């Protein structure tokens, strides 16, 4: 017999502030309770404008560096996956996010501050229920030597492998079930990671201005710049965090065995679209990157 899952929102509003990883500016993010069936909705404040951008697959507009949603024009909110990983872990289905920048703050580079913030606000269980996504046949997406598979399972679990051209990141893998407790202790604290040469190249273009050892694991050609890691395999754990956050865009709890190799945001969202197409029987609108710059000169100056 399938366990009934109730929709959830937060009990009280909570404000989180942090640095935008690209702008280097302080970003304010406010989370508010919402009625059942509201879903997850961002309100982007730009001057006197208040722009509504729902969290849904049809609103994903770019996956090149992070997962970005938009309203169909130039308005968008990027780097939503760390927040959504925490939201999904705690079972939040209905919440309003007010934000004063085009990017969710990077915080410490993980989902932990969002998880702690939501827990501090309290969680309210709603009367309404929500049906989890389950599949009866394998679903997969492939891009060259990269792939992402979802197999039928009564629980959520993952087997993830990464293989970068780096002595510390060759063949790093991790397998685990993903219940709330395991996600909270073993996955959500894992920080984003990057290579020093890539960070320097981005900063030369006026991007990644908020990136630092305070919010990322940074790798040199032969080691880590950071004094210590939270886990020996923190990098692959963070990729699992990203995957959970990206699939949370589906807007429903999900179950299955996820098997990933060298995947990323684009494959994550492609799999989510395949899953929802099978579950609903409807073909979802294909997202199209408008190739909007991460920041315009005007936004970067704010």
From Swiss-Prot:
KW Zinc (keyword) present: yes
- Which cofactors is this protein said to need? Zn(2+)
- Residues given in the record as Zn(2+) binding sites: 82, 238, 242
Q: In which pathway does it act?
A: Glycolipid biosynthesis; lipid IV(A) biosynthesis; lipid IV(A) from (3R)-3-hydroxytetradecanoyl-[acyl-carrier-protein] and UDP-N-acetyl-alpha-D-glucosamine: step 2/6
Lipid metabolism keyword on record: yes
Mind listing the UniProt keywords for this protein, alphabetically? Answer: Hydrolase, Lipid A biosynthesis, Lipid biosynthesis, Lipid metabolism, Metal-binding, Zinc
**What GO terms are given for molecular function?**
metal ion binding; UDP-3-O-acyl-N-acetylglucosamine deacetylase activity
The record's section on InterPro entries has: Ribosomal_Su5_D2-typ_SF, UDP-acyl_GlcNac_deAcase, UDP-acyl_GlcNac_deAcase_C, UDP-acyl_N-AcGlcN_deAcase_N
Lineage, top-rank taxon, reads Bacteria
GO biological process terms, semicolon-separated: lipid A biosynthetic process
Alphabetical list of Gene3D superfamilies matching this protein: lpxc deacetylase, domain 1, lpxc deacetylase, domain 2
Q: Which GO terms describe its cellular component?
A: membrane
Q: EC number(s) for this protein? A: 3.5.1.108
- Catalytic activity from the UniProt record: a UDP-3-O-[(3R)-3-hydroxyacyl]-N-acetyl-alpha-D-glucosamine + H2O = a UDP-3-O-[(3R)-3-hydroxyacyl]-alpha-D-glucosamine + acetate
Q: Which residues form the active site?
A: 265
Pfam families for this protein: LpxC
Q: Which PANTHER family match?
A: UDP-3-O-ACYL-N-ACETYLGLUCOSAMINE DEACETYLASE 1, MITOCHONDRIAL-RELATED
Q: Could you tell me what this protein does? A: Catalyzes the hydrolysis of UDP-3-O-myristoyl-N-acetylglucosamine to form UDP-3-O-myristoylglucosamine and acetate, the committed step in lipid A biosynthesis.
Q: What family is reported?
A: Belongs to the LpxC family.
The record's NCBIfam families line, in alphabetical order, gives:
lpxC
Question: Under which name does UniProt file this protein?
Answer: UDP-3-O-acyl-N-acetylglucosamine deacetylase
Instruction: Provide the species name.
Output: Leptospira biflexa serovar Patoc (strain Patoc 1 / ATCC 23582 / Paris)
Q: What is the taxonomic lineage of the source species?
A: Bacteria, Pseudomonadati, Spirochaetota, Spirochaetia, Leptospirales
